[in-house]
Amino acid sequence: MEEKKGLGLGRLVSIATGTVIGAGIVSLLGVAMLFTGASGWLAYSAAVIVGLIVISPYIILCSTMRINGGNYSYVSAVLGDFWGGIYGLCFTMVGLAMGLFGMSLGTYVKLIFPSIDVRIFAMCIVTFFFVLNLFGVNLMAKVENVLFYLLMIGLLSYVVMGFAKMTPETITVGQPDFFAGGAKGFLSAVVLLMFSTTGQSYVVAFSREARNPKRDIPLAILITTGVILVLYTLVGFVTCNILPASEVAGQNLAVVAREIMPGWMYYLFLIGGPIAAIFTTMNSSFVIFSRPLETMVKDGFFPATLGKTNKWGVPYFLITFIYIIGMLPLIFNFSMGAIVDDSILIESIAEVLAIVAVLRFPEKIEGAWENRYFKFSKGFFRFVVILALLTRIALIINTCTTLTPAIIVVTVVSVLIFALYNYFRIKGNHVHVNKSYELQ
């Protein structure tokens, strides 16, 4: 059976797709329309393309080796234990976004059950997926596979019903509210929407369980990118061309769904579309965010006790730590905007380190370049990685211009704390980075 041999391409695609299609498509499109009006769908297409540029180094890297500890494995191998530790801690803190996923899910469930408390429900659903992930990757992958098909049916029904309802009069291309915020507004929308266009690269965390990681991980990322380019563009086009942009901006997909679907189908869409989308992302997030920590424990950044596993091979202390991180925004009632802003900035800092490591790995990891599955040239490799690095830096600069000083200060202080922790842990001779990748 497949679980004995490892995860095949099909399951990796469903995991990657389920991870990337989540709170973003169902919650952020309306926010993006506040910046750019009815051109929100075009901003989504651009965000997917820019996102592919940013994650392209990982596609190349994954074709050369099995990465057992997520991106942390090669960052520490190439840049050293200090920078590897900073990457791992920064990446793990993106787990704060699970609070966003829970709140987004709660807003949709409230449309079906108006009496629920959104924040309490969000806490319950994060807890549910925490417990589910304690039973191992195989169960998680099976659940993800089912949710994937439910998600596709839900979003495609939204697209089909939307195009059936659309008329030439409702199409806004060329109208005053198209590019409503000008070039700056459009760019701000692209940067915001990128929060939901790069998550397919997180499938790297499942390299250890993949049957043929050097081929299937890159293909899963590319296939998923193609899927979301088409799906996000279509969903966005429907969302921006049924009702006036002023009625949809700042709202979620339910506003348009209620307009284009009969009552019974509207409720089925809520379950198969937005709710399934957020379910798939939350389901895979525990493994994705805990995988670097698992390897960091083995390398000595944290006490060995934290790496203990249960009978399903799950590091339950680390999964619990990720659970606590995800619950913090819910317990302290952080705003969704603050969660997104902080997550984007912390992730961007971590990804700069990861891209620099990719650029240097052919010289630092002996035999890796010769071992690549896809035989691209070094010139092409350098062009792609440098373009990704420059794009990521430009995005950080643009993001900082739109963030509040408080978010920037909190992020910088967090990174400094991570750096100090790593410094004293290494100085105390606790850290001994082990090889956590395999050349096959």
Predicted segments with their positions:
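Membrane-interface "cap" regions at the ends of multi-pass membrane proteins
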Residues: 1-39, 51-56, 68, 173, ...
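Membrane-interface loop-to-helix entry segments
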Residues: 118-168, 180-181, 198, 221-226, ...
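A generic transmembrane alpha-helix motif of multi-pass inner-membrane proteins
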Residues: 345-347, 377-440
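Transmembrane alpha-helical segments of multi-pass small-molecule transport proteins
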Residues: 11-13, 45-46, 87, 112-139, ...
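Helix-loop-helix connectors at the membrane interface of multi-pass transporters/channels
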Residues: 2, 74-78, 102-122, 154, ...
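Hydrophobic transmembrane alpha-helices that form the core helical bundles
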Residues: 31-35, 43, 53-134, 139, ...
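TM-loop-TM module centered on a large, flexible mid-protein loop between adjacent transmembrane helices
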Residues: 73-75, 80, 111-113, 222-283, ...
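Helix-loop-helix junctions that connect adjacent transmembrane segments
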Residues: 2-3, 117, 145-267
